[in-house]
Every structure is written in C-alpha cells, then in structure tokens.
C-alpha cells in the first residue's frame, strides 16, 4: 500500500501506463496477425499493403520503447521475407 502522496501518484501513473502500453502491444500483435493471415491466403498484393500499415505500427511501438528496436526490426524482416517468398 502506497503511504506517501508521491507513492500514491506513482501507483496511479503505473496503472495508466500499463493500460496504454497494453493497448499498444495489442495493436502490434493484431497488425502482425493481419499480415500473417494475408500471407497465408497467398495474396501478395494484399499482404504488401497490410505489411506497409503494420510496419508503421511496429515502428511506432518501438519508438515508444514498448518493444526493443531490434525486436521491431526482426518482426519487419521476417514478415518481409515471408511476403517475398510468395512470388
């Protein structure tokens, strides 16, 4: 239990940040799933379009330090390779 005003405020901020970060992580996972689904469907044009949107989401989440920049690069690289393999 937070005893000081500062500790209570930090606890409140932590809860709000957790909600926000969870939302961003969920958005990231959804974007990646959409790309994987279009790859599984075999539609290269649609996959490329969805990948472009997912790249934006991945970069945004990495910029906010929700995931590490190397993890973001790894996601983008693997998705791009999978799209390229559709040819």
Curated annotation (Swiss-Prot):
Gene Ontology BP, a term: translation
Keywords for the protein's UniProt record, in alphabetical order: Ribonucleoprotein, Ribosomal protein, RNA-binding, rRNA-binding
Chain segments annotated as coiled-coil in the UniProt record: none
GO molecular function, one term: small ribosomal subunit rRNA binding
Residue ranges, annotated region (Disordered): 1-24
InterPro entries, sorted: Ribosomal_bS20, Ribosomal_bS20_sf
A GO cellular-component term linked to this record: small ribosomal subunit
Similarity section: Belongs to the bacterial ribosomal protein bS20 family.
The protein's role, per its UniProt record: Binds directly to 16S ribosomal RNA.
Protein name: Small ribosomal subunit protein bS20
Organism: Bordetella petrii (strain ATCC BAA-461 / DSM 12804 / CCUG 43448)
